[in-house]
Curated annotation (Swiss-Prot):
Keyword Repeat attributed: no
GO CC terms: cytoplasm; Holliday junction resolvase complex
Name of the gene encoding the protein in the UniProt record: ruvC
Record's catalysed reaction(s): Endonucleolytic cleavage at a junction such as a reciprocal single-stranded crossover between two homologous DNA duplexes (Holliday junction)
Upper taxonomic lineage: Bacteria, Bacillati, Actinomycetota, Actinomycetes, Micrococcales
Name under which the protein is recorded: Crossover junction endodeoxyribonuclease RuvC
GO molecular function: crossover junction DNA endonuclease activity; DNA binding; magnesium ion binding
Cellular location(s): Cytoplasm
Amino acid sequence: MRILGIDPGLTRCGVGVVDVYADRSARLVDVQVVRTSPTAELHHRLLAVGDGIEELVERHRPSVVAIERVFAQDNLSTVMGVAQITGVALVGAARRGLDVALHTPSEVKAAVTGYGQADKKQVATMVARILGLDELPTPADASDALALAICAGWRAGMSRAGIAGTPTPTARATGADAASGAGPTAAQAAWLAAERAQRGRR
């Protein structure tokens, strides 16, 4: 499964493309950070980020788009920018008929590190290890986008294997994946526990 992860931001938007396989291994395809000037007009900035995402979607043809879910922040201008870019990304995915996976930062951290409160360096370190990279992906927007893609791929894979229950819209069953029978990694098991705990608080 090829997944395009988006760490939404108006000044810097991380976009990472990852192939995730039935055995839960993952391979880096591409990663970029789309940047806009804070002094540019808002509509031009939104267009620039949208065009950057669209270019990578066109080039790599993902089957799923994974986006960080907007959550409350004290900085209103920051959360507004994140929400605006999230909207741009969602519209682009809908136009192409792509599945969308939304994950909170704590879900992503738990998926790749086993700890929902991991810091940026811990996330980048685990992303590099999972993808077999010689160096940590930088800046943080890039590693966060890759972590989102990995999280979405592992969740879809676990849903297919019946580990996480009912498949989500991002999980389209294939016989090869269902037959693999591989259990979750330690990080995946921790993510599942975090997800169940979150559901219990709803």
